Amino acid sequence: MKLINTFATELPWACEPVAPQPLHAPALLHLNCALLGELGLVAVSEADWLACCGHGQPLPGMQPVAQVYAGHQFGGYSPRLGDGRALLLGEQQAPDGSRWDLHLKGAGKTPFSRFGDGRAVLRSSIREYLASEALHALGIPTTRALVLVGSQEPVYREQVETGATVLRTAPSHLRFGHVEYFAWSGQGERIPALIDYLLRHHFPELADGAELFAEVVRRTARLIAKWQAAGFCHGVMNTDNMSLLGLTLDYGPYGFIDAYVPDFVCNHSDPGGRYALDQQPAVGYWNLQKLAQALAGHVDGDALAEALAQYEHQLMLHYSELMRAKLGLAVWEEDDPVLFRELFQLLAAHGVDYHLFLRRLGEVTREGAWPASLLALLPEPAAWQGWLEAYRARLAREGSEDGVRKGLMDAVNPKYVLRNALAQRVIEAAEQGDMAPFERLFTALQHPYDEQPEYEELATPQPAWYCGGELSCSS
């Protein structure tokens, strides 16, 4: 292998060269072997990965840089953020010709670290590693995780933890905040070059900045629709955490819902619920408005407005498609919004587990008794009778065969979900040097729709005693 460096060489004014800093007593904890194979990196030895991600030693062709960007954080503009603890090491060309960033998080201080130490802790590194691969397996666009390295280096957060690094990968880590930085720092003349870079390397099928923005709107709308259908709350939807490629980016205090709570907040630094689950679609639009403002003067204003006007329609169209599939419905009917709304009201009112309900709903047949496994989830089954009868009538109108429908529903309603309690158990074991629980959970999450009876204990509801719904931004 030999890395290439188009970002560093073509956009040198958008980054600063920085060497990764070694960790104290690093240890290789996990390699994502399947993904390494897809990217053509199987020839790199475990020793070389440890040397790179733990000891700060270069891979062939590596030119590490920290990228500069800005961002709106909780509604307020921060004019200079950038990679405060992550480095773009270079880009790997995969066997299929695609190009992938190698991005090392926890690599040490950079010119953009401000008051931070440039490190990541094992806890947050495990959470990012698991979440990125879990979302990928669910079909949600995301950065991916390649290598996890732990260490004996003390890192000070709310308490003393140990440092770690994650080598993550994506076609690009370009963010809304990259455009904002140059727009509002008196360097607007750089934006055409940034647009040109995106068009040449990531959107060659598009003609200009107007088409680029329209595609960013479309991808963002579809991404957030997928989050909503999956019950995934990102937690920190600042514009510096929004991908120009429509990827899930920067896993902090994220969370999947358990019981259906529409205003679920997973970040204890968000007491006002700005980034609550049910606010994500509106925040996506707000963030796109900020991107449009940064592009104004470089992209036709009417084209920007026209693209923004399509956001809600695109999001709702895709979300409706996803939810119909989850309910095993093949065609659209005019009353579908009512069916969905009444379901969500019941789920919220009765605290029913979102994922288990949808999985077990696939056992409903057009005739006969209601599945015992489904009724066991419902604290007041009688309250559900009206909705279940309406649902069964809907199935009868479609005439779908029960077994076929169940197979289709199982293929979109996961049995295995990255619940916070599961992640916490894995983290606690890893902090004691036991990676076996991590390996089991990682493997199960690779195939979330399969039965996998050998991992059955990982498919149970979040325990009632677990109250860890909100998490810290510290990582």
From Swiss-Prot:
Domain of life: Bacteria
Pfam families recorded: SelO
Ligand binding (Mg(2+)): N241, D250
UniProt key word Metal-binding: yes
Keywords recorded for this protein, A-Z: ATP-binding, Magnesium, Manganese, Metal-binding, Nucleotide-binding, Nucleotidyltransferase, Transferase
Any one GO molecular function term: ATP binding
Residue positions binding ATP: G82, G84, R85, K105, D117, G118, R168, R175, D250
Active site per UniProt: D240
Catalytic activity: L-seryl-[protein] + ATP = 3-O-(5'-adenylyl)-L-seryl-[protein] + diphosphate; L-threonyl-[protein] + ATP = 3-O-(5'-adenylyl)-L-threonyl-[protein] + diphosphate; L-tyrosyl-[protein] + ATP = O-(5'-adenylyl)-L-tyrosyl-[protein] + diphosphate; L-histidyl-[protein] + UTP = N(tele)-(5'-uridylyl)-L-histidyl-[protein] + diphosphate
Coiled-coil annotated residue ranges, if any: none
EC number(s) recorded for this UniProt protein: 2.7.7.-, 2.7.7.108
Keyword Manganese: yes
Cofactor: Mg(2+); Mn(2+)
InterPro entries: SelO
Top EC class for this record: transferase
The protein's role, per its UniProt record: Nucleotidyltransferase involved in the post-translational modification of proteins. It can catalyze the addition of adenosine monophosphate (AMP) or uridine monophosphate (UMP) to a protein, resulting in modifications known as AMPylation and UMPylation.
Record-linked PANTHER family: PROTEIN ADENYLYLTRANSFERASE SELO, MITOCHONDRIAL
Assigned protein family: Belongs to the SELO family.
Protein name: Protein nucleotidyltransferase YdiU
Species this chain originates from: Aeromonas hydrophila subsp. hydrophila (strain ATCC 7966 / DSM 30187 / BCRC 13018 / CCUG 14551 / JCM 1027 / KCTC 2358 / NCIMB 9240 / NCTC 8049)
